[in-house]
């Protein structure tokens, strides 16, 4: 019986069973099927019933009035099908066969229950003053709307009629023709379009604020004698559809010229028009039907959103597409059409067809300014307050416009500002308006009581079941009162959506800390310099420059169109230039993964620039994008480190000019990648040879005059290698000083601390005296190489002998403290408690392990 039922028809039966259970009925009748059809909310049957004024709530109240609720105590399980329902299902199958449909849908189910003359469903409809014959007529209209092939009327026999009546009437739906001999067709515009003017009268559209210039130009083009078909062209999200809705608003309010006052603005749904066309000519037939109706009425303005879809729409082997069908009528002025599409789609599809392009008059729609966006948000404010049940402050509207313009890239105002406001409202509602815990506990208690009641029924303890039923009833009454009080409190005490809520949404979406500074973060920014100087030794001036840039950015006083800071780090190798960039990423940007490191030695050739922003179209790797641009696009809040820029080709440095000045770079896809929330750091060894050769300075600068001299020489080397327009765009050029012995000593301490933390896994504690540290500094002292030789010294004199110790089985068995001792240019490790070598087995006379032996 159910083999041919569609998914919607099966869903109707499930909903009908739920309605039967809700009414405490242990059977499934035609009235439940009717309620299931209406509750589904979609399908031919629902459309027909709604057209005739029947909705779910009305039918539900009528069913409850007619048959009421069943007894509380009932057998669990699915309700049984009544005889009438079984007959209605059989009748539905027969109706589908008569209509030559190979499926049973909601329309057939509705016809099936109508054929049960003594069913409750038919009585419900009659009480609601709905004529079953009208339902049959409307079903046929609906089927004709979607071009379903109905069989010849002579081949269909009406239900519940004898042979004599069949000979008199040949209608497929009960012997009633639609409007005489010729069936009446539903309006093609109603079938495939939406009346925007009608929707605005019913307050189903959002109000349109501003855009007066665009709406005025739209009206002027529509009032022309020839070529009066405007097309709105603009980026996605700038408000093209809203401008058309603004025209509908003006038509309804009468604020248009006399020529447009009685016009109806109808949106044409091209996808709906194409859907279901199985045979050649069906699509063309539907378009011609729409065009004929527009010609007939004479007061219709068609609106086609995504106008580029008419190019190629419906075209198959040898067939013509929608654009070719519309061209003659557009040229003669028989129909008026408003289009909307994006700039890219207009260029790709419309401009290629010159004949189609000249029939439309282009109106370029630019994104509104921030101030205009705020006005638009004020107009939409009430709608979002009602939806989220919150109160939106004026500061939140301004913040949504400004923050979306500053931080959300790749999208356009006002769309991105509206999205921010919408999500902020949802965030506040979800976080503050959850169901109270008392209600949750009470609902759990009701469910527990209900299960106990059903268990008592199953064991035939009817007295206990009756007691539990009364208890459940009291709990439900209490729950209803609590919910009513909670709902009223929600309406009375609306939670505000403020500037901070909008900023939090921006932070979640982009990863950029747009929220106001907290006290903890302010303290962190003030002490950032001290924190970095503990990690980057001996470079206080460079650390101070970076910290100043970060403070300017987080307090909002920096130039919003440039990066947070752009620095050129100069000085000899191994003095902490790259390390400082890494520590900034860790301390302020959330981790070392926020550091985008670009090794400029990979860009020695001129053509290597394509790796940075992507290969041009047609070249290998175009789809992959640029190594730099893709990383910044995914993580816009980061540190970008260009390491050793002097090794790159000079022409490649020209790419960085717009990054430093305008905070953006255009990739191979034409997208503008935003660098305004990044810190740009470039390192270079230019002039390092001057430090090595300078006999005046030696190792370690001991006077301000020394530093001034070396700075002057390095600046001269930089100007010789880099272009003036590049140098002038930098915020600051920072010269790192050569490391003094005191700084090297601190660095050795840091390296030993790292080693000690690694040895904690082996239950080993290190004690390194100052004499050993001085020895290591002396061994690692190299003015030309900076601090890097210290790493090799630590490896040679400390890590190598310790590694051999760990490989000895006797050293793994207990916790120990090791003390390093300097002996004849060697470092020896001893147990601190016994003052003997950690590797000596007690009493065997073996020698301690030293660095030289290892």
Curated annotation (Swiss-Prot):
Residues reported to bind ATP: 234-241, 571-578
Record's keyword annotation contains RNA-binding: no
Residues of the Clp R domain: 2-145
SUPFAM superfamilies: Double Clp-N motif (SSF81923), P-loop containing nucleoside triphosphate hydrolases (SSF52540)
Keyword Nucleotide-binding: yes
A Gene Ontology molecular function term of the record: ATP binding
Stretches for region Disordered: 151-182
A Pfam family reported for this protein in Swiss-Prot or TrEMBL: AAA_lid_9
Residue span, UVR domain: 443-478
Annotated region described as Repeat 1, given as residue ranges: 5-70
Repeat 2: annotated span: 81-145
Ranges annotated as biased composition (Low complexity): 151-172
Similarity annotation: Belongs to the ClpA/ClpB family. ClpC subfamily.
Protein name per its UniProtKB record: Probable ATP-dependent Clp protease ATP-binding subunit
Native species: Chlamydia trachomatis serovar D (strain ATCC VR-885 / DSM 19411 / UW-3/Cx)
